[in-house]
UniProtKB/Swiss-Prot annotation:
InterPro entries associated with the record: Ribosomal_bS16, Ribosomal_bS16_CS, Ribosomal_bS16_dom_sf
Gene Ontology cellular component terms for the protein in this record: cytoplasm; small ribosomal subunit
One GO molecular-function entry: structural constituent of ribosome
Record protein name field: Small ribosomal subunit protein bS16
BP GO annotations: translation
Gene3D superfamilies per the UniProt record, alphabetical: 3.30.1320.10
TM stretches of this protein: none
Keywords: Ribonucleoprotein, Ribosomal protein
Length: 107
């Protein structure tokens, strides 16, 4: 069973609120999850400390057991200065370094 750390959307229409959850990668985005490890409210200002809340000890636990975070969750984890496993760090850095904008084709 592959486990992911990802966002699950909740809240009303045009008023999004996301739970940061540990879920099986086959389950739907808003479907069943194993554990809730935080929340993200994009409606709050960026400097508000309640915008992103994480349970750092539980995230470290799941990362040590092989959970794969999504790109957005990796950004949140880095804000909280949680150390990512070396394999995830390499994968994330490779994606950023190999990104090259393709030149437009002129005819």
């Amino acid at each position: 069973m592959a486990v992911k750390i990802r966002l699950a959307r909740s809240g009303a229409k045009k008023c999004a609120y996301f739970k940061i959850v540990i879920a099986n990668n086959c389950s739907p985005r808003d479907g069943a999850f194993i554990e809730k490890v935080g929340h993200y409210n994009p409606m709050l200002p960026k400097d508000n400390h309640e915008r992103v809340v994480l349970k750092t000890d539980r995230i470290e636990h799941w990362l040590s057991h092989g959970a794969q975070p999504t790109e957005k969750v990796i950004n949140f984890i880095q804000q909280f200065s949680i150390t990512l496993p070396l394999a995830i760090q390499k994968k994330h850095n490779i994606k950023l370094k190999n990104y090259v904008a393709k030149p437009s084709k002129k005819k």
